[in-house]
């Protein structure tokens, strides 16, 4: 999907003001992909499929999709799976599996789209797109603080194919050409790595290094470690309810969301009111975290609870500044807290949130 369909890879703890409200930053979209069959583009929602389904394995945080289109010469099926690694938080893994019931001329297009959707953007400048053999990398900086970000991407086809790289329409793309044998399945693995200037000194080099390491280890190894890490989390967090399977599923699905957005990758960060689902509520940390989420982590993951509490301690300086700004003594903690305790709440807030 392109920006008009609102895809977003939301960064935790990095904010920027361009126009309007200050909000979290969306990364260049390393998941951008589509298919051509016999020269014709096939993607949703532009081309209606004859069958389509999506599913989420919430126990392991894996998203699956399968889509079949009818073409002029037969049927083509695309199956994908995608996960943000719980074991190595800077990596996203994707797998494409393509099959057809005829000799189809296939072009799989996948890469990085730098034209992303923002509520009040754009938030990135000095955008650079570079290709390196089978890999590619996009670098940029945020407007306000000049924080560097890097998104690297690489693919590996398990079958003979012709590959090209192109830069076009704000995108850097792999074009993978091959011809299907009827009934055969063609698998392409893809890795996306993400680093920022808050993670490391040189995000670009770290992103490329981890990309090469992930390719060497292989998709299946990355997925196995990801699954194993999820199982470790469930040992301490899974809820079992006798006699009410639906209630049990609902509770564990909610726990999946909490586990997905826990900031285990750092030592001082909190969870925004909308998690990492987008830029609504300015990506700010409300007191919802302490009221509704903290108890769960205190009972199941004290190390993460410590990270959440340390965020409040570390934002004391921002609370002191806010109190002084309004003429008060002491500390006045933020209602909509961003980094450093900056309060993103306006003096006169929205009158119609919808």
Segments from the language model and where they lie:
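Acidic/polar, glycine-enriched structural segments that form the non-catalytic walls/loops
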Residues: 1-281
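Amphipathic alpha-helical interaction segments
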Residues: 9, 238, 294-295, 300, ...
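Active-site-proximal structural scaffolding
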Residues: 26, 89, 247, 269, ...
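Alpha-helical support elements that line or immediately flank enzyme active sites
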Residues: 97, 251-259, 289-303, 315
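Short, well-ordered loop/turn and helix-capping segments at boundaries between secondary-structure elements
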Residues: 101, 114, 195-197, 298-302, ...
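Short, contiguous, pocket-lining structural segments
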Residues: 246, 284, 297, 354
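Helix-terminus loop motifs that line ligand-binding clefts
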Residues: 262-277, 300-354
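Segments forming glycine/polar-rich beta-alpha architectures that bind adenosine-containing cofactors
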Residues: 278-284, 289, 295
């Amino acid at each position: 999907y392109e920006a008009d369909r609102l895809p977003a890879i939301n960064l935790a703890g990095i904010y920027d003001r361009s126009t309007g409200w200050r909000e979290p930053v969306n990364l260049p979209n390393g998941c951008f992909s589509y298919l051509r069959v016999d020269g014709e583009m096939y993607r949703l929602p532009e081309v209606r499929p004859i069958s389509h389904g999506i599913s989420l394995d919430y126990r392991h945080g894996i998203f699956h999709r399968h889509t079949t289109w009818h073409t002029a010469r037969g049927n083509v099926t695309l199956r994908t799976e995608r996960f943000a690694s719980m074991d190595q938080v800077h990596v996203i893994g994707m797998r494409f599996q393509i099959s057809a019931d005829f000799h189809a001329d296939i072009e799989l297009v996948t890469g990085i789209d730098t034209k992303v959707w923002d509520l009040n953007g754009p938030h990135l400048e000095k955008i650079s797109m570079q290709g390196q053999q089978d890999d590619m990398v996009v670098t940029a900086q945020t407007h306000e603080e000049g924080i560097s970000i890097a998104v690297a991407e690489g693919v590996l086809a398990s079958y003979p194919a012709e590959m090209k790289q192109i830069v076009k329409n704000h995108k850097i793309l792999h074009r993978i050409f091959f011809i299907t044998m009827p009934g055969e399945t063609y698998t392409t693995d893809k890795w996306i790595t993400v680093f920022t200037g808050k993670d490391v000194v040189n995000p670009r080099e770290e992103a490329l290094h981890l990309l090469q390491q992930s390719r060497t280890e292989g998709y299946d190894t990355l997925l196995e470690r990801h699954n194993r890490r999820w199982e470790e989390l469930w040992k301490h967090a899974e809820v079992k309810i006798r006699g009410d399977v639906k209630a049990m599923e609902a509770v564990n699905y909610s726990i999946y969301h909490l586990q997905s957005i826990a900031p285990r990758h750092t030592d001082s960060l909190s969870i925004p009111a909308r998690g990492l689902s987008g830029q609504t509520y300015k990506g700010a940390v409300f007191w919802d975290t302490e009221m509704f989420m903290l108890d769960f982590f205190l009972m199941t993951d004290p190390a993460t609870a410590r990270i959440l509490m340390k965020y409040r301690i570390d934002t004391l300086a921002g609370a002191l500044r806010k109190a002084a700004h309004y003429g008060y003594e002491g500390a006045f903690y933020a209602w909509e807290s961003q980094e450093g305790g900056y309060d993103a709440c306006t003096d006169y807030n929205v009158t119609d949130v919808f």
